Amino acid sequence: MTMPTQESDLVLVNNTESVMEITLNRPDKLNALTSAMYRDLVKLLATAEQSDDIHVVLFRGEGKSFSAGNDLVDFLNAKPGEAGEAAHFIQAIHDFPKVVVAAVQGNAVGVGTTMLLHMDLVVASEDTKLITPFVDLGAVPEAGSAKLLPAWIGYQRAARMLLLGEPMLAAEALEIGLVAKVVKGDELDATARNMAATLAKKPPRALQASKRLMRESINKPLHQVVKEDLALFGEMLQGDEAKAVIAAMVSKSKG
């Protein structure tokens, strides 16, 4: 697999056992995201999507916070066309077909929170705060958060986040299903990496197809979802991947 040429060392990548680990590496600025960083992230996602060797992507942030969101100075100084780099990244992560895990600690501000809505499993440290201060910045919620948050956590909780700008703490985020697991800070990376490694060992086509069904079902009527998942279930069972897994299980049961 040929890795893309990156514009800076503010985004690091490490591939281990079918997992691409992407690290936001700007701890002195709380991993605030610049246009160049967004471009690097889009390139890495494209590489991961095209590679048969990568089954899962893991996002993490170096230092005490996952991400402070957009670098406002960079955003204000962006050249024509660069202001859309964040949107390109959100579109890329939304469309990404493989499973994405996130390890989140400290503050996740703005897009640092809304990007998580397009990832599949979020592991948070106990000190995590999900902060969406869009109105306070004279803006509006982005990355589909105005649709996804009310649908997932209820309008009133979403209004606390998006209108009042109240931080969502890790414990409540776990309780209402915004994150999959909350762990101690010193256990965060190991927990997220173990989760990613576990996912990467699963049959890749089945994993991707299951993610697609879950994501697409959000906007489809139940009867259509049932029809499509039953058809895909039958198709997958006839595939080489499922046959190999089932044959191995039968062989093991026979001793």
Tell me the role of every PLM-derived stretch:
Residues 1-17, 165-171, 186, 190, ...:
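C-terminal alpha-helix plus adjacent terminal tail
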Residues 1-62, 91:
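Conserved CoA-thioester-binding segment of acyl-CoA-metabolizing enzymes
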Residues 22, 26, 41, 59, ...:
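Terminal peptide-recognition signature
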Residues 37-40, 85, 115, 188, ...:
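Hydrophobic alpha-helical membrane-association signature
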Residues 42-46, 53, 61-95, 108, ...:
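Glycine- (often His-adjacent) and acidic-residue-rich active-site loop
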Residues 85-89, 144-148, 157, 209, ...:
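Hydrophobic alpha-helical segments typical of transmembrane helices
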Residues 94-204, 239-240, 244:
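Crotonase-fold acyl-CoA enzyme core
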